[in-house]
Amino acid sequence: MEIQEIIKNMTLEEKSHLVNGATFFGSYGIDRLGVPRMQLLDGATGMNLEQVFGDMTEYEDWSNAEERKQIDADTSKPVNMIGSTRLVHVIEHYFEPEKLSEDEKVLYGWVKKHMDVRLQGKDYAPGCYPPGILLGCTWNPEVIRKVGEALGLECCVYGVHFLLGPNVNILRDPRNGRLFEGYSEDPCVVSKLAPEIVKGIQSYGVSATVKHYAANSQETNRVGIDETISKRALEEIYFPGFRACVKEGGTKSIMNAYNRINGVRCTESAWLLEEKLRKDFGFDGMVMSDWGAVLDPAKALAGGTDLAMPGPGEPQAIYDAVKAATLSEEKVDQACERVLTAIKWITENYKKEEVDKLPVDEIIKQTDEAAYEAACEGIVLLKNDAACPLAKHTKIALLGSGHAQMLECGSGSAGIDTSRHGDVAAEFARYFDVVDEAQAEYVVMIGIVPGMEGNDRKTLALADEDLAVLKRLAQAGKNVILVLNTCGPIDMREIDTDNVKAVFATFLPGMAGAKALSDMIAGEVNPSGKLTITFPERIEDMPTYMNFPGDGYHVSYGEGIYVGYRYYDKKKLRPRYPFGYGMSYTTFDCKLVDAAVDGDTIKVHTTVENTGKVAGSEVIQIYIHDPYSTLAKPEKELKAFEKVKLAPGEKKDVTFAIAIRDLASYDMDLEQFAVEEGYYDILAATSSAAEDVFGETRIYLDVKSPYSYSVDTQLKVICEDDALLEAADSAWAAEGWDIGLIRNNYQYSPQKSLREILVYLDAHLRTEEKVAHFIAAFEENVRTIKKK
C-alpha cells in the first residue's frame, strides 16, 4: 500500500468518505484503490457482541436479506437494527438460542451464518476480562500485558482491527459511571501499567485506541460539558497516561473525548491534538472521535480529528467545506494519510491468518489464564480479622446480589455478552460446604454496584437490597465475609460492622472472578492486590465533593493537582482505605537501605523479606516529598513501584532508578516543566498511609533550574533566608550601596527581585560596571548555598 499514491488517485468525494465512518463500527473501504474496510470495536474488557452484530446488520445488509422477508411483512424500507429489541434478544441468548422466539431465531441464524465465516467455523465465545480498575490493583505490568495479548488474540478471532481501549482517564471521582474502566487516581500508576495492555493488544497487529483524550472524567452531560482545568493539572495529572501510551506503548490510535476543556471541544482543539499530542508527546498515529462527539466535521478535521465516528458520517460536510475554501484539501489529505498509515500498519502486522489456525482449546486456555491471573493479582483484601483463609469444608452460605453470578463487567461500551461465566456456587463448592444461612458458620456476602456508561452514581452506597441483608446479618451476629463486587469505592461506615470478619474488593473481576475469589478465600491464592484509588471515609471528604458533576454544562476541576491521596494527605484527612493499601496472608519485613543521586537518576535501594509461612507478593512504593518547593506541591507523590513475589523466608533486593526529570513540576508562569534544585525526601512504603512508610531519607539535587538563586530571585526568598540575605548584603554593600533599600522593598514589594530594585539607586551609583560586578559577586556568594 503506497499511501501517497493512493491519496493522489483519490477523488475529493472518496477522501471525504475516508475521514468518516462508513457504518457504526466500520471504516470506509475503497476497493478500486485496495483500501480495506476496517472493523472497530469496544473495548479493553473483551469483544462487545452488541457492536459486532449491530454493525454486521449494516454492512452485510440485513435490510435486504432473504431471511428478513420471512419475519417482516414490509421489507420495502431499510431498518436500523442497532438497539432493536429483536437484536438485543439475539445478543443476550446467542449462546442459548433455544430461548429465542421463532422470529428471533431467523435473525439468529442469519447472524450466525456470517459469524461462522468470520470465525472460520470456530465455536468460540468471547472472554470477559477485568477492567482497568482491577488491572490497576495488580500493580503488575506483566499480568496486564498478558490481558492485552488475550484481547489482541480475540480481535483476530473476531476480525477486529481497531480495539477501542484502554481507557486511561484518571479516576477523579468515585461516582463516575465509567470509573471502573480506568486504572488509577495516580498518573504514575497509569503511566507504568496502561502502556502494557497497548503492547499486548498490538502484538497481534491490532491497533489499540487509547481513550478518551482528555480528562473525560464524568458521564453527566458528558457530550459538550466544559471543564475548567488548570494547565498544571492537565500536564501533571491528566496527560501523563496518554503520553506514556504514546511514548512507551506505541499506540497507533487515540480517541478524543466528548467534553470541552477550557472552552474548546476536544474534537476541535488544535492545542490538544496537534501541539500536545503530536508535537509534545510524539504521536504519529490516527486520532478518531468518540462516537457522536464531532458536531462540526470541518472544524474537527482542521483541529486534528482524522476519523469522525460513527458512520455513516457527514462526508458531504467535508466535501462542501473544501469546495467553499473554508477547509483546505491539504488538511483533508493529511487526515487521509494518517488513516491510511494506521490501516497499512494493521494490514502488514495483523495475525488473523495465524490465529485462525489455532485450535479453539488453545485459544480458550490462553484467554482463561490471562483473565484468571489478573483477577488473582488484582483482588484486594481490605480487612481480615483472622477469618481468612477459611478451613476446607467450612459451612458457608452465599448471599447478596452477586451470590449466583458475580458482576463480571460493566455495561455500555465495556459490556460483554458471553457464555463463559463463573458459577459462584460451583466454584465455592470445590472447597466448602455450601449450605443455607441458618446452618452456615460464615456468610459470603457478595454485594454489587454496577457501573454504567452515560450515568454517574449518586452515592457510594451498596445496592439497597444488599444493605438490607447486611443489616439483618449484623443484627443476628452472623459472621460475614463481605465481597465488594462493585464498580468502585464504597461507603463502609454502615456495613463494616463487628460481625464482618473480612472484606474483599473484587471490583468487576471478569469471567474468572468467582474462581479467583473462591481460591483466595480457601487460601489457594494469597491476596496481593493493592488499591489504586482511595476509599474515602465519607463522600463529603472527597476532593471533588464540591465540584462534581458541576453546574449544568460547566464543571470546575477545582482540586487542581490534588487528586486522590494527594488531597487527603494535604488536608490531613484519614480515608477508610488509603491508596496503595492491601493485605496479605503472610507478613513482610521491608527496609530502605539507601538512596543517592547517580547521574540523571536517583537510585533507591530497598530489601523485602517474606517473614510468614506462605508465599506472597508485596508492592514496594517509592514516594517523593519536596519539603522546600517554590511551587505548591502535594505532601508526597508516587514515582516508582515494583511488585515482588517471595517464597516463605525469601529475601530480595529491590532497586529503583527514578529519572530526575520525573521530579519535574509544571510552572504555569514559565509554561514549562522544571526540576528544582534542593532537598527531597525519599519515602519507601507499602501504601500511601503514614504508618506504612518503612523508610525515609533525604537527598540533595544539584541541578540548574529557573528557581536557582540569582539576582532574579524574589526579595521574599532572599530576606527570609539568613545565608541568602548575608550574600546579598555583602555584595550590595561592596558597591557602596545602602542595604536599607533591600529591607524597604522587602517590606512593601517582596515579590520584586534584586535586579528590579537596582533602578531605585541613583544613576551615578548604578553604572554598568558596578551592576555587573554586583551580579557576579552575588551569584558567586550564593553558589555554595544549598537551596532548600
Where are these regions (language model features)?
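Glycoside hydrolase catalytic-domain context in secreted enzymes
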Residues: 1-665, 679-684, 688, 773, ...
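Short, solvent-exposed coil/turn linker segments
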Residues: 6, 328, 423, 436, ...
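Thiotemplate assembly-line natural product biosynthesis machinery
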Residues: 374, 721-724
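Generic detector of short, aliphatic-rich beta-strand segments that form the cores of beta-sheets
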Residues: 577, 697-698, 728
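Terminal connector regions
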Residues: 660-705
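Intrinsically disordered, low-complexity regulatory regions in eukaryotic proteins
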Residues: 694, 705, 717-718, 725-788
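Low-complexity, Pro/Ser/Thr- and charge-rich linker/hinge segments at domain boundaries
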Residues: 700-720
